[in-house]
Amino acid sequence: MASTAMHSEPSAAAVPRHLAIIMDGNGRWAQRRRRPRVIGHRAGARAVNRTIDFCLDKGVSALTLFAFSSENWGRPQDEVDALMKLFLHALDRGVEELQRRGVQVRFIGDRSRFTAPLRDRMAGAERITAANTRLVLSIAASYGGRQDIAMAARALAVEVAAGRLQPEQIDEALLASRVALADLPAPDLFIRTGGDTRISNFLLWQLAYTELWFTETLWPEFDAGVLQQALDDYAGRERRFGLTSAQIAEKATEASSA
């Protein structure tokens, strides 16, 4: 759950390089105000902008947002249509500002289900911002973690069938090179808003050693204060990657004396 501890500023080492977020709670936020769910999604878009601002300010180098899962296509059609319109509007209006601020935009997921105009806007946003280096913003849209792993396995199977790869050459590193976000460091910190405590088929491979942080805060209410709580909690955690605390301490001592 969300930590209530607050510090003025985490050290540079405590700032995650890569932050991954499930943005949950737009619909409930709107329902509590007796408004249509699409109003919640619009409010959620403003929370995205606040989160980008925070990452740029703190020096986070990669931000991955779960915008629309492969399972979300099963939602009521009017909600899906409204989300697609909002997505298209955001691409039309927001890319220039992201370009100005040095944000590189990427999309991961199955684009084939989107309309041609939306696919064109997605490709255009990636092309326009490709050279930016301040922050890599990856939008997971029509994405599923199992689907991601299956596609990576399929790509390796094609190489085996073509004789370019032997089955015994396939290992974790090779599979990791085929999943989404392969060129980025694995997420250091995962955040889910809205109170649920599960990862919902998001980045299943990539989150293997990621620190998980959950908050009751609904996504439209997510702001720098809540993000700072997450970073404060993250700063106090010991990331062992399968080692013991003593081994981690020994490595830290060796690094400081080198």
From Swiss-Prot:
Partners and quaternary state?
Answer: Homodimer.
- Report whether tRNA processing shows up as a keyword of the record: no
What InterPro entries does this protein map onto? Answer: UPP_synth-like, UPP_synth-like_CS, UPP_synth-like_sf
Stated name of the protein: Ditrans,polycis-undecaprenyl-diphosphate synthase ((2E,6E)-farnesyl-diphosphate specific)
Is Transmembrane there in the keyword field?
Answer: no
Sorted alphabetically, which PROSITE patterns does this protein's record hold? UPP_SYNTHASE
Q: What is its EC number?
A: 2.5.1.31
Organism annotation:
Xanthomonas campestris pv. campestris (strain ATCC 33913 / DSM 3586 / NCPPB 528 / LMG 568 / P 25)
Q: Which UniProt keywords apply?
A: Cell shape, Cell wall biogenesis/degradation, Magnesium, Metal-binding, Peptidoglycan synthesis, Transferase
Residues annotated to bind Mg(2+): 24, 211
